[in-house]
Amino acid sequence: AEPPAEPTAETQTVEETAPEATEEADEELPEETQSEEKQVISTVPQYFQNDYPYTMYGSGTIMTSGCSIVSLAMVASYMADHAYTPDELAHYFGGRAINNIARLEYGNKMLQLACRKAENWHVVYKALQEGQVAIVLMNHNSIFTNSQHFIVLAGINENGKIIVNDSN
């Protein structure tokens, strides 16, 4: 089955997964994909940047510039035997922002999470079909932001829609 049209975003796929989410993308999957068995994932925690208005992160706070650390906290909590919070990870990384792919990979390494960088949307979609989750960097052409913004793709629901954990 073919994945939906390729979004214009850098992606990172985190392995060993199975999730929950809160928002669902409006984009329908191709009909032949919808007839396949779907994996419903419901255990990725949801955190929000607005819950951390005073926790320093990079040159701002988690609320103003912490989508990457919030996304990492969601996935790390899901993958590890520990409920990581965004403020805990911000302190762990010394308040240094990890708002790019290389630093996010570093965060995964420091937390000893299995991850791999996906080269295109097809790799991400296949990972979701296999029950994995993904942290993706959306660009200004997406419905999530007018600049850049990290979100978590937490799976594919029973209706064939991608489950999105958005920190905003």
Protein language model regions, located:
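Active-site-adjacent structural segments surrounding the nucleophilic cysteine of cysteine proteases
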Residues: 1-95
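Conserved active-site-adjacent core of cysteine acyl-enzyme catalytic domains
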Residues: 71-168
